[in-house]
């Protein structure tokens, strides 16, 4: 059975302002994932399932100014559609370091991921690399990722492909 998940990484109040350029695409990806889940459920779940997951970064370093646990900055941005309670917290760049998220993956037999979020040069990069290293199929939604440094996006998309990720726009999956 193919179980999939849309993973939205670090779209929080303290993230780069560039998230505003892609929030419409991220919300469209969430709607697509919901429709995909309904389609799979209609098929009697014989083909698998689609989960929608949100990853939040918490910066636990002393003296930090951003992503502080319990602060407004660590909250998911208000413009984003939140359609599930699958919200996991990480303290490192790689989302797989979240024990709760890793347990969720195992419990739901998830083996394929569609990735959106920020930052393309940090947390998205580390998560995609480590997902591929763990043997998962990874699809990066190229129009649903952003960075503090937009000039690095083309380089990052090429990096994801070089590590075995499929890189396409959301429209190419719809």
Go through each PLM region and give its residues.
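Internal catalytic-core helix/loop-beta-alpha segment
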Residues: 77-121
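Active-site acidic carboxylates
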Residues: 1-87, 102-103, 165-166
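A short glycine-rich beta-strand->turn/loop micro-motif centered on a GG-aromatic cluster
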Residues: 114-117, 136-150
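Structural recognition of alpha->loop->beta junctions
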Residues: 75-88, 148-174
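Short Gly/Thr/Asp-enriched flexible loops that form oxyanion-binding sites at enzyme active sites
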Residues: 124-134
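A structural signal for isolated positions on well-ordered beta-strands in alpha/beta enzyme cores
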Residues: 5, 51-53, 112-114, 137-139
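Short phosphate-binding/catalytic loops that engage adenosine nucleotides
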Residues: 110, 135-136, 165
């Amino acid at each position: 059975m193919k179980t999939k998940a849309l993973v939205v990484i670090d779209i929080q109040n303290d993230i780069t302002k560039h998230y505003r350029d892609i929030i419409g695409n991220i919300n469209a990806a969430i709607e697509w994932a919901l429709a995909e889940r309904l389609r799979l459920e209609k098929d009697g779940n014989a083909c698998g399932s689609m989960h929608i997951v949100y990853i939040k970064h918490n910066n636990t370093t002393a003296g930090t100014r951003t992503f502080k646990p319990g602060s407004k900055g660590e909250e998911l941005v208000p413009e984003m559609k939140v359609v599930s309670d699958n919200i996991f917290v990480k303290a490192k760049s790689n989302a797989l370091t979240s024990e709760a998220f890793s347990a969720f993956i195992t419990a739901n037999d998830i083996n394929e991921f569609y990735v959106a979020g920020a930052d393309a040069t940090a947390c998205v990069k580390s998560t995609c690399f480590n997902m591929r290293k763990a043997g998962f199929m990874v699809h990066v939604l190229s129009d649903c990722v952003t960075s503090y440094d937009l000039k690095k996006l083309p380089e990052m998309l090429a990096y994801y492909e070089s590590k075995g990720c499929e890189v396409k726009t959301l429209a190419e999956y719809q």
